[in-house]
Structures are given as C-alpha cells and as structure tokens.
From Swiss-Prot:
This is Podocan. Residues 600-613 have a biased composition (Acidic residues). Residues 1-19 form the signal peptide. Binds to type I collagen. Residues 588-599 have a biased composition (Basic and acidic residues). It comes from Homo sapiens. GO terms for cellular component: collagen-containing extracellular matrix; cytoplasm; extracellular space.
Amino acid sequence: MAQSRVLLLLLLLPPQLHLGPVLAVRAPGFGRSGGHSLSPEENEFAEEEPVLVLSPEEPGPGPAAVSCPRDCACSQEGVVDCGGIDLREFPGDLPEHTNHLSLQNNQLEKIYPEELSRLHRLETLNLQNNRLTSRGLPEKAFEHLTNLNYLYLANNKLTLAPRFLPNALISVDFAANYLTKIYGLTFGQKPNLRSVYLHNNKLADAGLPDNMFNGSSNVEVLILSSNFLRHVPKHLPPALYKLHLKNNKLEKIPPGAFSELSSLRELYLQNNYLTDEGLDNETFWKLSSLEYLDLSSNNLSRVPAGLPRSLVLLHLEKNAIRSVDANVLTPIRSLEYLLLHSNQLREQGIHPLAFQGLKRLHTVHLYNNALERVPSGLPRRVRTLMILHNQITGIGREDFATTYFLEELNLSYNRITSPQVHRDAFRKLRLLRSLDLSGNRLHTLPPGLPRNVHVLKVKRNELAALARGALVGMAQLRELYLTSNRLRSRALGPRAWVDLAHLQLLDIAGNQLTEIPEGLPESLEYLYLQNNKISAVPANAFDSTPNLKGIFLRFNKLAVGSVVDSAFRRLKHLQVLDIEGNLEFGDISKDRGRLGKEKEEEEEEEEEEEETR
C-alpha cells in the first residue's frame, strides 16, 4: 500500500533569506555543523542543512487503513502532507495521532484553535506560503500543542507575531510576512529554542521587546535581515553562533552590544549605514569565536580597529575605504580571505606593513579601487590576488618579489603599457597558474612571462604582433586568450607556437587575420577565430591539429567554395564547426576580388608601419 511506503514529510526549513523550493524538515537536535568551511564566493552561509524525516520502511503494528483528508498523503506513523492542494479551509478530518503536518502552498486565511487543539502529538506544523493574517490566527491557536517543535509560518500576511507560542519549540520561521511587533512570550521562556527566522518583515526597534529572548538562552541562529532596525537588539541570547542583521538601517553599534556573544561565529552587517564613528575599538572585542564578518556596503572610510583575532573571512567591499593602517589587520593571524574591492583605496593608503605576519591570508581582492601601482608589502603567502579595474600603469621589478606562492594574478583593466613592465617582474612567480592582463594598453607581450602558467589572458589590448620568443619556454600553457587585439596573419608565423606543446585552447577572435594561422600545436582542441577577415579554409589548414574538437569561424569573409571539405577529414574528434555569419551565398568572384584588394591594402599599411618604426 502507498501509505505504508517511505513517506517524505515536505516541510521547509528557511532557505537563504528568501523563499525557495519546499525542502524537508530538520530533525530535533540540529545546530552547528562540525566541519564548517569558509569561502569568499559565499554571499552568506546556508541557514541550516535540511534533513529528511522518513517513516520506517516496515511500519509497526497499526490499523490497516488510516483516515486521511481528501487529496492528502498520510502514513500510519503520523505524517500528513496536504501541501499544494489549494486548500481554503483547515482540513477537519486529520488523524488524531498526526505528529508532522504539512499545509504549505495553499490558500488558508484563518485557523481556529479548536481545529488544532485535538492534535496533541503534533511536533511539526508547516503553514508557510498561505494567506494567513494576524486576525485569522488567534493568540491561543497553538495553546494546546505542547509537543510542537517546529513551526513554519513564512510567506503569509501576518502583521503581529502570536502572543504565545508553545514552550517546546526548537525552530520558528516567520520570514517574509509584514510583522511590526514581537511579544515577550512569542520567543521567551523556551529553553529548547535554537533558531528564529524573522527576515523580510517590517520590524523596527519599537517592535522588539527588550526581553524578547528571556528564558530562551539557547538560541543559536537569529535571522533579522531586511527589516527597519536602527539599533542592534538588546539582550541577545549568549548561545548565538549565527546572527544576520543585514539590510537594515543600522548607523552605529553601541558599546557592549555584542559583549555576551562569545560563541558567535558568523555576523552579517552588510547593507546598513555604519560609519567609522559608529564603531569603536571594542565593538567586536568580545567576539572571541567570530570567524565570518561581513561589513560590506556600509559607509566606512577605513578598516575598523579592534577586529576579532579569530576571523577567517572579512568582507569590507563596497564601502568608501581610503586607508588600511599598519596594525588593524596584523593581529588577525587566522585571516584567510580579505575582500576590499570596490572602495577608494590608493597605493599610498595601504601601509607597507598592513599585511605583515598574516601567514594564512591566501585570497585578497583589491579590484575596483584607485590603485596607481601594485601595493608594497603584499601578504607573502597570498595565492589569489585580484587587482583588476584600477589605475596601475606599470609593474616594477620588486612588485611581486616576495609573493612566491601566488597561483592566480588578475591585473586586467588597468593602464599597463608594454615599456612599463619590467622584464624581471614575474621572476619569482614559479607557482603562478593563471595570469590575466586583459584590457590594458600592451603593444607587445611582456618579456619574462612565468613559464609555468597554465592560463594566459591578454584580451582587449593593442597587440599587433607576437614578438619572436614571446612565448618561449611556456610548455605548460593550456589556454591562451588573445581576443580583440590588432593581430594580423603575417605577424603570426608558425614559430610563434613552437614551444606550446600542451596548448588546448587558443582564442584569437576579434583580430585582423586573413588566414588560419599555420603551425598550430598538435595538442590544440579548441580554436576560436570568429570576427576576423579570414577568406578561405585550404585543404591543409588543420594538418598540424588533428585533435581539434571545436572550430569557431563565425563572422569572417568565407564564401561558397572557399572552404575545402577535405580540410576537416582528419579531424576525428571534431564536435563543433561554427561557420555561420559568413558570405555563404555571395558572388564568389566579386568576393575574391574585393578580398584581394583588402589584402593589398593591408600589405601597404604594414609597409607604412615598418617605415614608421
């Protein structure tokens, strides 16, 4: 029978501060996870990991049939799922032994206390995504549910929180309502309460009582994001390890606001109005367990002093920070990720000793600032350094002399010119795997490029040729991007690629090539040549590249008859051949005549350039 099979109780644990797909309910005793990993790409940590509640494979002795409301799914173990069946009234024929009830995604507007009062065993009640109002949910609606552990009321139309909730609660979700007021016993006097979700409401300071968590000192997760709070709530539970206050109206944090939160590990304060004056040296002083702090998108002009020494990830992007002083970061010896992008930093604003002693700091984001040169005193063990979108004009000999462990370096979209790159600038970067110099003002590839690099990007520069020996010794190169430059066919001789024995991807799209380059590496798998002036594909075009999987020739000058079919016969691995956007139906003779004239004009331009040189 279907009712005796394993049945998932589809209940939602609050997702990442927005309502998403229906997930399963978390079992009692959930909380902090053991191996907590941090990543700079995370906008925020997940609220909780969902856990499925299953009824047993082989149910124990019980009635052969279970009374079940129409269109609902019920099990003999007390799991009832009435989610998403367009209910407009509370089902009246629920089994009395129901312990998990799912009513999410319906049209319920009101619930009467007597409808719930006989469900004495109820442990989980999911009412999220209905049309419940505070008037339709009486204060004593949950009075008799003495075993209720999990209550989900997210995405309804509540303006006032229930005045009384059962004392056995473990997790409560009121997210995405219109709440303006919380009462003292809404969350108070609940010793088992572990997580409270109140994000995306209309809560202001006056709507939160000072004793909101009186008698509920074990709360570990509190989400108050996207409200109208101007002050940090008072008397927060000392067991908190995750506190979300982002997207509020905080301007300052008063002394002692976090003084009792020695267990706090994650603090989210982004998208507020915090200023330098709103934080003092002791604001975060007592947060001895804090690992993740997000202060992005505020009004800070400097890196705050007195940050916790336990920090692993620090978000300071999208402020107005102009300076990083000598001693504000150096005490944070556990710091691994530092995000300072989208500020107003200049090279002189970063003290040469700002990163001294930060041996664990491996990821630094400094992009979208106003740096005129590479900052001195970079962290010695940095592995990922993002300095794109600044105003850097050159790279000096000693700029990267101490960053031996650097693996990824992004210098794209600066103002770097070829003469201003010292030939020994990259000499110490023996571990570098990715180098991005796109969007600069390079006329030639800089000399002395790291030989062990796997990915080299020099897109959107002013390259007219690859100088002899520019890629010499780069046998480890896998991907080379030369997109949107001024490269011409005569400037790419077959010797240009001779050392690239492991090259798999070559992108020369958006240049001025009239022919397919010769002597390409045998290892090549993907060749991008779109948006050039290539007029023909001869029979021997790909003789040196039998391993090609993708050829992209879109938007060139190819005409009917100019592509020799036999050119592709040896390409046993070819999966994609893109030649759309060419002159497939043009007058071949006219096309060839026009292309010949273009070639003559190109040769004349090249001769003039040589005379100028």
